[in-house]
């Protein structure tokens, strides 16, 4: 990870805490809470996007490709999960969330 001073810790912490919050979202998945889940996912994705942008921009050129790959996989997964939540198909939501969960755990490990 690039060290961009005091703000690095703040950006990495917010990425980590947003990922943790999204991991806790598993209990709410389902048709009843789909509107809430969709809004919460968009909110947390916005925070993560902003902080990843700051971290990637400040990273050394050699450290950027792994961060870009991780961010791209995460946001692709978010898009699939959001589409599944919108359709309210429980099987699809579970499948997409399982994929997203693995990437979120990787994000938490990388930002530690």
Q: How would you describe each model-predicted region?
A:
Residues 2-56:
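Alpha-helical segments in soluble extracytoplasmic regions
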Residues 5, 76-112:
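C-terminal amphipathic alpha-helix
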Residues 29, 33, 59-63, 85-89:
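Short coil/turn residues that cap or connect secondary-structure elements
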Residues 38-43, 64-72, 91-101:
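Short, charged, amphipathic alpha-helical segments
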Residues 51-68:
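Short, solvent-exposed, charged loop/turn and helix-capping segments
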